[in-house]
Amino acid sequence: MRQLKGKVKETRKQKKERKLDNLETQAKIRTVVLPALGVLAVFLVLFVYLKTRPAVLA
């Protein structure tokens, strides 16, 4: 028989595993990536604030 072009049909088990993997990936994004971006944003705001504040005359 000839080999048909295109992707192989996904079974129910494979589809369920893929969906579970996607859920795990989304959970990791929420617990790792978003806090890291938050920290970077805080450092950026702090850096800009410190560089643009007026000099204190003593």
Swiss-Prot record:
Keywords linked to the UniProt accession: Coiled coil, Membrane, Transmembrane, Transmembrane helix
This protein's record includes keyword Transmembrane: yes
Membrane topology qualifier: Single-pass membrane protein
Record GO cellular component, one term: membrane
Subcellular location field: Membrane
Domain of life: Eukaryota
Name of one Pfam family that matches: DUF4519
Transmembrane region(s): 31-51
Coiled coil (residue ranges): 1-31
Keyword DNA-binding: no
Major place of residence: membrane
The family this protein is said to belong to: Belongs to the SMCO4 family.
The protein, known as: Single-pass membrane and coiled-coil domain-containing protein 4 homolog
